[in-house]
Amino acid sequence: MTYCFDIDGTLCSNTEGKYDAAEPNREMIAEVNRLYSEGHTIVMHTARGSTTGLDWRDLTERQLGDWGVKYHALHMGKPTADLYVDDKAINVRDWQANRTDSPERKLDSEATDERRYR
């Protein structure tokens, strides 16, 4: 399976264009690395530089390396938009909550089990 991940606001903090100040999201990076280790194809896709025309590839590659992100390809030039509509899109928070090993999912299933046995 091929997974395509946004970078800012997904794998790191959203710094509103101050990319050198981005802080890694260690939980998401661990999940990406798990998928990579399972043999999935990991593609990074970012809008960095789309509005300014500046080339952020070197910084982005350095950050991904420093953060220990495992990936196969980096695509720059994602169009800038206020909202992306895509038949295969999922919000990062929803994706995290719906993983079978996520704490949120375990809490939901535990709550369901408790209600069932009352």
Residue ranges and their predicted role:
Residues 1-118:
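Catalytic phosphate/metal-binding cores of nucleic-acid and nucleotide-processing enzymes, i.e., regions
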